[in-house]
């Protein structure tokens, strides 16, 4: 007797949910051995937040020290170690790897791929980052303490004569190891985007976030090998007497050129992905397609190209760079960034806006990053830069740009994609409390630092005189820093509570208006992401899947990648026929 196969229409792929859990303690084994991009993305993100909180505690210690002159509960040496490791952790152990956290979580889903191109290399990249970060931070437990020469490690301050001890060596070694993980992660993301897009997913149908990760990964391959080589040279100087960075040979300026040729593309390496996150979120809460898709892509490419031509604006005060060229290029890079602002505002214009927590953080990003960008244009002028270089004006600018971009957009992304990754919703009331504490605390901390810099307070000083007149501003800044620190408590509680007890998501798209493919699969997705893929005929496949009655109107309005006009009304494109249904 033979069994008769059921009719084709009755077949349905069903996910066995929930997953089998295994014995107690199995989670640790799964974390160590996993190659699932979603789990690796969560591991990246959780690890980055751990580093973020450690770096934030260091900042609170420094702000407490600066609240009043003569306080000195930290020694000068401890203060130097804190600002060095604060900058290192925030930039290289939080901001850069959290890019790969979001890329792992979202990018394969957005292009319809079952995983990244090299899953084991992906896991290897994470472990390199983790152990590299631990090596760099372990300087605090060795005799002599951690690295204390600033996160920029200017020579000769960072050589063996001026900064002896294991802390500097651990810092160099840790950044080499973590940087290798970043380089391998970039190779993986480029290969994934180029080789693993779903049928119908042309380059100009990719989500903007995917575009930005692709461009960021290319920038990483340009910038990070230079940092790695420069660090190897510094290690050779410290241990082999290589004299690469000897002042007599022009080595001091050589280090600055090498470091900043990495350092300025690095600013955009940690900005572009978060521009992408903002570009994914705003259309969903404006109930509109993204305005100016093509110009956003070209603006991203322009920023990437210009980012490798402006590094010496960090070196205006050396008197050894061509001021007009680097000043002009720095002004120029504001143009594509302004285009992005124009598109974000255009997306919201006349939209049906609602202000859930992800959208609130997007608005916070827009305001904060705009102010930071304006002070950046001011610093692009050499006469102004000469006045405020190495003062708290630069510190304020730097934090407005980077906190405004990275932290606000990180929180926006966490609140936006948390339901997709966990199958549960975060608490909106706690989310709004978190936003307002973060927004108020940040601006209270850093707005007054512009005035401190204009008054002449130098950065990296552990104390100042009562007669300097800096104390009122420093008190305000310290109060803001503690508000900012307090804002993390509702966030951590929200994540913990919601992950275990939050409202369960029963639909593919809990926000209702998602555009890209991650909103066309379950929450959380199955191991290989999709049981079936919708047709990809525009840059909004999930929206068209959920609102098929809108497709004809969208075609008539001629969105990106579509032929339009009366003559094309009945034309069926070849790639529409070939995509799987």
UniProtKB/Swiss-Prot annotation:
Subunit structure: Associates with subunits II, III and IV to form cytochrome c oxidase.
Cofactor note: Binds 1 copper B ion per subunit. Binds 2 heme groups per subunit.
InterPro entries: Cyt_c_oxase-like_su1_dom (IPR023616), Cyt_c_oxase-like_su1_sf (IPR036927), Cyt_C_Oxase_1 (IPR000883), Cyt_c_Oxase_su1_BS (IPR023615), Cyt_c_oxidase_su1_bac (IPR014241)
Species the sequence originates in: Mycolicibacterium paratuberculosis (strain ATCC BAA-968 / K-10)
Recorded topology in the membrane: Multi-pass membrane protein
GO BP, one annotated term: respiratory electron transport chain
The protein's name: Probable cytochrome c oxidase subunit 1
Annotated Gene Ontology cellular component terms: plasma membrane
Ranges that cross the membrane: 40-60, 89-109, 123-143, 170-190, 213-233, 258-278, 290-310, 315-335, 359-379, 398-418, 433-453, 476-496
Sites where the protein binds Cu cation: 264, 268, 313-314
Positions of heme a3 binding: 397
């Amino acid at each position: 007797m033979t069994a008769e196969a059921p009719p084709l229409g009755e077949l349905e792929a069903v996910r066995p949910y929930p997953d089998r859990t295994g014995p107690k303690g199995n989670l640790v084994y799964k974390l160590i051995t996993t190659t699932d991009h979603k789990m690796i993305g969560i591991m990246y993100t959780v690890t980055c937040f751990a580093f973020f909180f450690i770096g934030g505690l260091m900042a609170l210690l420094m702000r407490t020290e600066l609240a009043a002159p003569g306080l000195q509960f930290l020694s000068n040496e401890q203060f130097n170690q804190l600002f060095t490791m604060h900058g290192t952790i925030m930039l290289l152990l939080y901001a850069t790897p959290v890019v790969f956290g979001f890329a792992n979580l979202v990018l394969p889903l957005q292009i319809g791929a079952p995983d990244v191109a090299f899953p084991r290399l992906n896991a290897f990249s994470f472990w390199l980052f983790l152990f590299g970060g631990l090596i760099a931070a372990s300087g605090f437990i060795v005799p002599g303490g951690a690295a204390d020469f600033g996160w920029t490690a200017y020579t000769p301050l960072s050589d063996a004569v001026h900064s002896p001890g294991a802390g500097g060596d651990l810092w160099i070694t840790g950044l080499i190891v973590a940087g290798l993980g970043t380089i391998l992660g970039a190779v993986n993301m480029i290969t994934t985007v180029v080789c693993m897009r779903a049928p119908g997913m042309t380059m100009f149908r990719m989500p903007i976030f995917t575009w930005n990760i692709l461009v960021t990964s290319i920038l990483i391959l340009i910038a990070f090998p230079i940092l790695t080589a420069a660090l190897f040279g510094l290690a050779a100087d410290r241990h082999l007497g290589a004299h690469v960075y000897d002042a007599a040979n022009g080595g001091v300026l050589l280090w600055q050129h090498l470091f900043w040729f990495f350092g300025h593309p690095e600013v955009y390496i940690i900005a572009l992905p978060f521009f992408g996150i903002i570009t994914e979120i705003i259309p969903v809460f404006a109930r509109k397609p993204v305005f100016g898709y093509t110009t956003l892509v070209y603006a991203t490419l322009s920023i990437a190209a210009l980012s490798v031509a402006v590094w010496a604006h960090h070196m205006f005060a050396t008197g050894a760079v061509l001021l007009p060229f680097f000043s002009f290029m720095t002004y120029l890079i504001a143009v594509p960034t302004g285009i992005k602002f124009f598109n974000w505002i255009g997306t919201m214009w006349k939209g049906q806006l609602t202000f859930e927590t992800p959208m609130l953080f997007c608005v916070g990003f827009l305001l904060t990053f705009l102010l930071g960008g304006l002070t950046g244009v001011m610093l692009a002028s050499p006469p102004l830069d000469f006045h405020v270089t190495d003062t708290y004006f630069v510190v304020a600018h730097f934090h407005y740009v980077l906190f405004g971009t990275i932290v606000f957009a990180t929180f926006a992304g966490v609140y936006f994609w948390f339901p997709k990754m966990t199958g549960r919703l975060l608490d909106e009331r706690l989310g709004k409390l978190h936003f307002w504490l973060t927004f108020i605390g940040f601006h209270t901390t850093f707005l007054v630092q512009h005035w401190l810099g204009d008054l002449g307070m130098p950065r990296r000083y552990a104390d100042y005189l009562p007669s300097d007149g800096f104390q009122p501003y420093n008190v305000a800044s310290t109060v803001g820093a503690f508000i900012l620190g307090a804002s993390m408590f509702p966030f951590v509680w929200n994540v913990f509570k919601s992950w275990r007890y939050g409202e369960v998501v029963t639909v593919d798209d809990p926000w209702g208006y998602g555009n890209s493919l991650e909103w066309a699969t379950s929450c959380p997705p199955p191991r290989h992401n999709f049981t079936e893929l919708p047709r990809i005929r525009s840059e909004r496949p999930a929206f068209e899947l959920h609102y098929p009655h809108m497709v004809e109107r969208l075609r008539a309005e001629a969105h990106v990648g579509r032929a339009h006009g009366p003559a094309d009304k009945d034309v069926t494109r070849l790639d529409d026929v070939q995509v799987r249904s």
